[in-house]
Swiss-Prot record:
It comes from Fusarium heterosporum. Keywords: Heme, Iron, Membrane, Metal-binding, Monooxygenase, Oxidoreductase, Transmembrane, Transmembrane helix. Gene3D superfamilies: Cytochrome P450. This is Cytochrome P450 monooxygenase fsdH. It holds the Pfam family p450. Its EC number is 1.-.-.-. GO terms for molecular function: heme binding; iron ion binding; oxidoreductase activity, acting on paired donors, with incorporation or reduction of molecular oxygen, reduced flavin or flavoprotein as one donor, and incorporation of one atom of oxygen. Heme binds at C472. Pathway: Mycotoxin biosynthesis.
Amino acid sequence: MALTVFEHASALWYRLQGSVSLAVLSTLAVVIAGWYILSSISLYFSRRQFIALHGCKPIANRYPSKWFGINFILEAGRTYKERRYLDALTWNFRNIGYTHEVRALGGTSVWTVEPENIKAVLTSKFKDYSLGNRPAVMGPLLGRGVFVTDGEEWSHSRALLRPNFAKDQVADLSMIERHLQQLLKMIPDDGKAIDLNDLILSFTMDSSTEFLFGESTETLTSGINRQFSDAFAYSLHDISSGLRLGPWYKFRRTDPKAVQSHRICREYADKYVEKALEYRRNYIKSVEDGATDKPSIDGGDSRRTFLRELALATDDREKLRDELLSLLLAGRDTTASLIGSLLFSLAKKPECWEKVRSEIEETLHGDLPSYEQLRNFKYAKYCVNEALRLYPPVPNNAKIAIRDTVLPRGGGPEGRDPIIVPKDAPVIYTVYALHRRYDLFGDDADDFRPERWENQRYTWEFLPFNGGPRICLGQQYALVETLYVLVRFAQHFSKIESMDPEPWTESLALTVSSGNGVKVKLERGSSDVHGLSTQGVLIDYGGLFAPTQKVPGTGVTQISKGKA
């Protein structure tokens, strides 16, 4: 059948349209390819200029990647499951190089335990790095808190929180003692073996929530707030899993239990934020009315808690909640990790336990410790430092370069020259391996030996709480709470014996802890302290682990000996 004029025209139009579409697509492909080639050439020459300007040399050491680096990923997964991931990283640094490059799936990362490199990342080149995927992974729980923000937003959070760690606001020692007493009650009197791990976590949860919220979860006693405690633990588990996936975290399936846990935690914090804002409103009203008494809520509660002090600085509900949960993460897990590792180590070293007990008894004679006495316990502090060295609570950290930048070590034949870190490349520094370098800490760097701290001071070789502008705000809180627990345990128990025949094994999440728990047998001494009268006493944390001058006019109240 003959085609009509209309059908001829339609066929011609479709042929022309197809030709035009093909021409457009071809042109677009050529433009994109040309742009990519020109961009690559431009990047090549600009990086050559950058390398020459900074004297960078090719990196000296590389991980032996195979199958596009899949062997590295498989090895990391295998050693993590075997609970020896950190030891495997330490082996890499000792045998490949203290700074080396890893190539996997088309990406390049730099791994380092060189103090000068870590110092550069955390100080002089601080603005060249971001947190990578941390905000996206941790955001569902922590929102826009201090641990998940960069730049001006982070600076604002830091400035908001810093005043609340002033010396006279850090902790009420009677509060720590009260929760410690609940912990001691959970330890059997008959000398039976016990795993202290969960008890320590409950203790730090209870003390941290009272310090931050103004009200404890009391998980060691009533367990009324166990839902929040369990939800918080599961939220941290979910975050840890997401961070381990790195850039592939986006492809994991949503965990409904994690979503529910995040919601429970945020709603729990919201209740206390609202109370703090009510305190703020009453405070402003009392100032306007010229009142001299502290404002109160709930029928007369006028305590000055951490959250209330924070609420006096801002009335942003989300900000208060996000910062509160961020600090709880640090206060609960970091301190629990340190206390657990310390007691695990001392249980394996009875001679060290005896030295701690002797030092404390010679000083206290059955009294509760004063702040000045805590400052002067040399051997006890050596033990705390040694636990931090061997088992830093946060053993691994990473930053992502947001522009081409430089590390001062790792290039050239000897690895002593600068190297370039390209934009978007991760830099991973492993504090766990840094603290076990034989050239820095001796041939016995893998051993628990507190005496190494007698005549030795370290700077960027010892980083249990990070360094630079992002150094942990609450490090003195964690250190003093740990030291106080050690002193009180030494007063309470004459012996601590390890019931775990195996060496320390890692359990790696956001923090690291003993994978087999803290299984010990404790023998109570003939006497404890002469009394527990620490009511209403404040402790000054400033300078506990480093000599400092007391600043006049700070309002710091020293604690006195607590006798009955």
